[in-house]
Structure formats: C-alpha cells, structure tokens
Design a protein with these regions (language model features):
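Acidic, metal/ion-coordinating pockets
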Residues: 1-231
Length: 231
C-alpha cells in the first residue's frame, strides 16, 4: 500500500530498499530468489497466493540484481495465466537479466547462462513443492521438482560442458527453522554428486548452515542451505 501511495498511478518500491542502494555495486554477480510471481496483469496480492507488481523489478535492477531464480512454492499461485504473465514481464527486461525456473515442459532445455569477467556461469532452479498445486493445464512452461532426478541429471549434464561454474537454486526445507532436514542434506549431496559447483538453498526464510560437500567424482561443492529471499 505504501508503494502504491508513493507511486500514485504506479508502484514505487525504491523507499523499501533505500538502505541497500549502492551495496551490491561491489559484487560481480548478484543473484536473487524472487519468491512471488512478478507481472503486469494481476492485481497485487499477498498471502497465500502472491502477485507482485512489475515495478519491483525496476527497483531490483537498479540495485544491481541481474540473476533471478523463479522456481519456488509460489510459482503456480496464479495458474497458467500467472506463468504466462510472469514470463512475459521478465522477457521484457534488459538483455543482461538472466532468469531460470520455468522450463519448457517438452524439452526442458531453455538454459540460462551469464558471462562475467570472462567466467561463464550456468544457472538452474528447482523447488521441493508448489504448495500442493499441480502443474496447471494450458501452459507450456513449469517448474521442475527436486525429486525429478532424471530431468535434473540431464539438465546438469547438458549445461556442465558449457559453463565454468554451475549454480543450482534449491527451494526446499522447513519454514522458520535453522535446522537442516534430511531431504535438504540428501538433495544437496545428490546435486554435488552430479557435479554442481554451488547450491543456493531457499524457502525456510531464516539462515541455515553453509558447508563444503565432496561429490562422487571428488569435486568440491559449496552449499548454503538457506539464502536471503524476497517475497
């Protein structure tokens, strides 16, 4: 409501992030879990079925964010139309914006890459669940669930030769607890075994442990089982 009051005929989120202005300029890569559908079609809506006005991405972009993970438990909050509206909004962002999380449900090969200072990053994004909502009918795009090992393994194998650093967002765990559960541990280790370099965990809304894991091929993987999110 405050953002609407400030913007008049639009939403202005800048004041909410004013204290962060300039902070992210010091980093080469700024990644963010966008845990609501951002779009220009649906009215703004809160818990439990979220919708965020498109103006939020102007603020986030100006703060320095360029990489956005879109796969989480709220990805299906507005059904097929919500997916379409959100993807259309992100597609209209500047060319240096990278998103991942809504995959072509036939090929699963709309991969996301970013090259910074000569280093190529590959990004994948998955979720443990979508609050019980199934993949909507009438959409060509959707999320990949973390227990779909066959699809995930193929995506990792496809991307691995094309990037120097492969980063996976894993939306999983239990909200409101600092304790890492068995599903998180097992999933993180499995991802490490597939050759992932970095695992960024989201969903619990609190900070959990960071750790180095050794994959099946002797590779070393850094995992942060909960990172900061915006919702």
């Amino acid at each position: 409501m405050q953002a609407k009051e400030r913007g008049g005929d639009h939403y202005d989120f800048d004041a909410a992030y004013a204290a962060m202005q300039g902070y992210y300029d010091q980093f080469d890569v700024n990644w963010l879990n966008q845990e609501t559908l951002v779009n220009d079609e649906f009215a703004a809506g809160g818990y439990p079925m979220f919708s965020t006005p498109g103006e939020i991405t102007d603020t986030l972009y100006n703060l320095g964010f360029r990489v956005f993970s879109l796969s989480n438990n709220h990805s299906y909050d507005k059904g097929a139309a919500g997916i379409e509206a959100s993807m259309a909004h992100w597609a209209a962002m500047p060319d240096d914006v990278v998103t991942m999380g809504f995959y072509n449900l036939e090929t699963y090969d709309n991969y996301a890459y970013q090259t910074v200072n000569g280093i190529t990053f590959g990004y994948l994004s998955y979720t443990e669940h979508t609050n019980g909502l199934p993949t909507p009918s009438g959409t060509d795009y959707g999320v990949v669930y973390l227990d779909d090992h066959e699809t995930i393994a193929k995506q990792i194998a496809d991307m691995r030769p094309n990037c120097d650093v492969l980063i996976v967002s894993a939306h999983m765990g239990t909200e409101g607890t600092h304790e890492v559960n068995d599903f998180q541990r097992e999933t993180a280790q499995w991802l490490a075994d597939q050759g992932v370099d970095v695992i960024i965990g989201t969903h619990p809304h609190v900070v959990q442990n960071a750790a180095w894991l050794t994959g099946a091929n002797g590779n070393t993987t850094f995992t942060r089982l909960t990172a900061w999110a915006t919702s």
